[in-house]
Amino acid sequence: MDTKIGSIDACNPTNHDIGGPPNGGVSTVQNTSPLHSTTVSPCDATLGRYLARRLVEIGVTDVFSVPGDFNLTLLDHLIAEPNLKLIGCCNELNAGYAADGYARSRGVGACVVTFTVGGLSVLNAIAGAYSENLPLICIVGGPNSNDYGTNRILHHTIGLPDFTQELRCFQAVTCFQAVINNLEEAHELIDTAISTALKESKPVYISISCNLPAIPLPTFSRHPVPFMLPMKVSNQIGLDAAVEAAAEFLNKAVKPVLVGGPKMRVAKAADAFVELADASGYGLAVMPSAKGQVPEHHKHFIGTYWGAVSTAFCAEIVESADAYLFAGPIFNDYSSVGYSLLLKKEKAIIVQPDRVTIGNGPAFGCVLMKDFLSELAKRIKHNNTSYENYHRIYVPEGKPLRDNPNESLRVNVLFQHIQNMLSSESAVLAETGDSWFNCQKLKLPEGCGYEFQMQYGSIGWSVGATLGYAQAMPNRRVIACIGDGSFQVTAQDVSTMIRCGQKTIIFLINNGGYTIEVEIHDGPYNVIKNWNYTAFVEAIHNGEGKCWTAKVRCEEELVKAINTATNEEKESFCFIEVIVHKDDTSKELLEWGSRVSAANSRPPNPQ
């Protein structure tokens, strides 16, 4: 028997260009289970219980799983951990999405599936978590340790005696891989995998042979040493030089602005970014995938910068600035609206988690974003010109005209009512599609959460992610905005939400197809079979648990449904199907779709 350890090279910083792979996360470990003694009982001194204790130690109290014959014994031992709850999902893809949503709230998530048929099913969700810099522990129940190297063919494989197909697939979307088929090194591999996920803020893969979880071993008889992750520190000389150069660059600008990007999460730099905004007085914007990371009630907040589809008057201020500092940006074809942003490199300071680049000039490595922003705040001159310009040109958006009592509901009216539902005790999850653009216009109250998956953009993500986020934050009311096409991809785990007693509100926007794809490139393949969605959810409910549904076609019905969901059914899972016209799309989606389509349609370069 041998133990294979995958490379962690994928985590090493290799590309610091704009839009390059994110890296550099530093995580704090929370020990949620006080240790009352240094030893554990012999029946608990097993590999399975050791893994369970380690998950609890880092703050994971819920694991999302799908049972299979290779992971059943492992699941028994995870269930036996009193501080760990096993959440059975309807399929592996949703289990992975749930772990993704959980990690967005708790800081780390975990899922357990079976060998190959489960592993390859969850792979898409793991890839999404990798792209979004989320630490996620993907655990797979693997073949019996005696079968390695025997040239045997096993079920749940592609019919070859080589068992590494699954491992090779995961190597591309995880930062560390451990195949545990002997007990001697199991604790070391588990600890290395978990600590690597936390350090790199990326998913890891752990495969455990199905005959090992129940075996006692003296190694597991003592409580493990708590995780102590080394804190990354900036190179002081580089930090000082970067701050001096950036301060000189910004202090001579007339109307500089700040723009927050999604990598602020992995850099844990949101507070430092706000500190810089307070000190500078600059207009403060966020990229779309950073919405929710910066308080929108900040006095200098000017909205979402998304090129041609920015919130009102934000693009005018950002693109007319003579200097802009981007903290943790990702410039891909989606966030750049088909590479159409009107930005100039010579005007930009790009701050990545561990690197600062100033205009066309110097780049400073080994400089942590959090340290850089905090030190820069001490050196920057106050200049509120960009915010004053925004305030001068800003015209408040008019409220949508009230619908006639029996008129078909308009999408902008729907989101006006969703806006009124938001509070510090709520969170919004936006599915890929027109909800991206409508939710960007929501003004988040202080403390209101917000999540969506922009880099990977996998339709259907929000169903599983809503399950995981709500499980991690039971005291928040999660509001999910999901299109009908996306819902059909992953709808089954509404069942799990009801079974777990979650009080989520899902707005199912029924417009008869894949609207976002229609605006990129239309065709008959974007038309879907209409479901009776409320009847579908009622069938899943089947009289067990708290569930309430409504189908609304006009504003009057919507108001009544929201009132019910937020009052007498506030402790229930609520599903509101909103029927709108298929052509009722946001102008932002129309603009964005045409530009992304143009980028996709570029002819080949001449050879």
Curated annotation (Swiss-Prot):
Metal-binding is among the record's keywords: yes
UniProt catalytic activity: a 2-oxocarboxylate + H(+) = an aldehyde + CO2
Assigned keywords, A-Z: Decarboxylase, Lyase, Magnesium, Metal-binding, Pyruvate, Stress response, Thiamine pyrophosphate
What are the GO cellular component annotations?
cytosol; plastid
Induction remark: By abscisic acid (ABA), salt, osmotic stress, wounding and paraquat. Not induced by anoxia.
Where would one find coiled-coil regions in this protein? none
- What Gene3D superfamilies does the entry give? 3.40.50.970, TPP-binding domain
Give the main EC class: lyase
**GO biological process terms held by the UniProt record:** cellular response to hypoxia; response to hypoxia
Cofactor: bound how, per the entry note?
Answer: Binds 1 metal ion per subunit.
Region annotation Thiamine pyrophosphate binding: where it falls in the sequence: 434-516
Residues that bind substrate: D69, H156, E517
Q: State the needed cofactors, names only.
A: a metal cation; thiamine diphosphate
Q: In which tissues or organs does this protein occur? A: Expressed at low levels in roots, shoots, flowers, siliques and seeds.
A Pfam family assignment: TPP_enzyme_M
The EC number on file is 4.1.1.1
- GO MF, one annotated term: pyruvate decarboxylase activity
- Per the record's keyword annotation, is Lyase included, yes or no? yes
Self-association state and partner proteins as the record states:
Homotetramer.
The entry assigns this protein to a family as follows: Belongs to the TPP enzyme family.
Q: By what name is this protein known?
A: Pyruvate decarboxylase 2
Per the UniProt record, the source organism is Arabidopsis thaliana
